[in-house]
Design a protein with these regions (language model features):
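Terminal beta-strand-rich extracellular "head" domains
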Residues: 34-39, 54-55, 60-158
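Disulfide-bonded cysteine-rich modules in secreted/extracellular proteins
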Residues: 27-35
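Extracellular "spike/adhesin" assembly and maturation modules
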Residues: 1-28, 47-52
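Short, polar loop/linker segments at the starts of domains and inter-domain junctions
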Residues: 39-47
């Protein structure tokens, strides 16, 4: 998926709309949540991690999902975060697994990112989460200084 860079500019040249449309457009939408979320073995949309934006064909988008603190079950288990299209069972765009190999609770921040294109139109992106076991209290820990983010950025033409 190579980027389609802009042209070189020269002094005195006229900046055209075609050239302007080749620049990145930046943040298309974002979702932020400071509410903790208790994990289950069923993949569901994590609290607050859903957004929509209007995509244009042939443009490159970066989607990022960040959880400041994922707390595992208190036994050996996996915590999974996924970026999906449409809903909790939609097309997987990116996925990450945090494995706790010990019989003790473990914690870690998690970050996923993906570069992709879409057809023109409305696009819904969700961040989902699940765990393999629920022994203890596996959760996504958030508060006013540790908040989850789901972000879509337009990087320019593809």
């Amino acid at each position: 998926m190579p980027a389609n860079p802009n042209t070189n500019f020269t002094t005195g040249a006229t900046l055209s709309s075609n050239q302007m449309n080749r620049f990145p457009r930046g943040v298309m939408n974002s979702a932020v949540s400071s509410t903790s979320y208790t994990l289950t073995t069923t993949e569901t949309i994590a609290t607050g991690m859903s957004l929509s934006f209007t995509a244009e064909a042939n443009r490159l988008y970066r989607i990022s999902y960040y959880e400041p603190q994922a707390q595992t079950a208190s036994v050996a288990s996996n915590t999974q975060l996924t970026i999906r299209r449409n809903n909790a069972t939609g097309t997987v765009l990116q996925n990450s697994v945090f494995t706790n190999e010990t019989n003790a609770l473990d914690q870690s921040g998690m970050y996923l990112t993906v570069l992709t294109t879409f057809s023109a139109g409305s696009v819904t992106i969700v961040g989902t989460a699940k765990v393999s076991l629920t022994t203890g209290t596996p959760q996504l820990i958030r508060d006013s200084t540790r908040f989850a983010n789901l972000l879509v950025e337009d990087l320019g033409p593809n």
